[in-house]
Amino acid sequence: MARILAVAAFGLLCSAQRPFSTSELIRDPGVYGPPLELVHLYYDSFPTGIAVSASGRLFSNYPGALDQNDTYAPGNGRYTIAELVSNTTESPYPSAAINSPPGGAINYTTYPPSGAGYSNYFIGSQSIVIDALDRAWVLDTGRVQTPNGTLVYATYGGPKLVGINLTNNTILFPTTVAFPDSYLNDVRFDLRKNVTASGKGVAYITDSSVEGRNGIIIVDLGTGESWRHLDGHPSVRPEQQYLSFQWGVPLYANNAGKPFGYNSFGADGISLSADGESLFWKAVGSRYLFSIPTARLRDNSATSEVMAQGAITNHGQTGQSDGFELDSNGYIYHGNMEQNAIGFFNPANGTDQIYVRDPLINWVDTFSTGTDGYLYFTVNQLDFGPGFYSNAGPDRRVKPWAVFRVPLPYNGTKVLLC
């Protein structure tokens, strides 16, 4: 009898044992939200921006300031603005000629070399945006890298806002607005007639310069007058010792010939609210989102800077991000690269949420909402480039880069401020 009990006990003990493995452990699914739809693959030049016209035409820019391989020199065939003409090919836009400044994008007759000061050629375009009237605008920094990776200073004529197919289509920035070390990064447009005396609308531009003079530039599109606000304010500057991680790797700044540093990009992502009454922005070197009433930025009176600095709202942390975009729901979309994700801020309740998550997402650079109800965005591995620390070599980018799209929630579409 005792033996029978012992055998029974042993059997119960054996049946109570569980397999020792990870199969029953909860794990990160890696994906969330609507699936990504592949739109375009880039096999040649390094892209940042994406813009979608009302008819579905796609445009991108290739800034020579972020990759010396995109700097135009005579005979190399490079361009800084292109139309995506098939799933895998691009063509210079609006022409190869305007993308080919005589002698190249760098003026080697100055010391040190500087950006070519051509007002009628693209030098180093950082952004292309389609406005509410379906017009394309190109934001040119006037800055590019030399073959050894040195970022040259801009000269007058280089930094500009160019409206394609407009009667007066180029707005030059004075050197008191676009400094030689400025980096004009992104732009948004409000074309409502009541926002400026000229009745032609206004543009808001971020200056994300890593050299430090960050701020917001405002442009009257009718008169061409421009001015700055919030210069050096903490809201447009990177956080001290800001460090983010991508796919397990710390993103220290990789400064050639110098010790590793921190991400020093200032105000970059920018978006208007759906009613045009607020402007949102965020530094790449920060997780904090800020906004200001646009009326405070359009004011250029004697006390306007004092009033502007007192009107800023801090909306808290929204993750590591670059570009922004808006939809008719009022949501402000942004990357959340540490989560392989796209998030959105809801001004109506002050919360930030994840909308899409996928292992294919690394650095979400630029967004564009289409009138077709989709959110388009570039994924370009910027964080794997030579500008960031890497323990696996100076450049870990692997072609191709990509444009994806996802449907906007709740029948969202492009906001037309006009």
Give names to the regions the model predicted.
Residues 85-90, 166-167, 220-227, 233-235, ...:
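Short loop/turn segments immediately following beta-strands, especially the blade-tip
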Residues 1-17:
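Fungal secretory targeting signals
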Residues 60-61, 138-140, 205-206, 281, ...:
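Residue position within the beta-strands of beta-propeller blades
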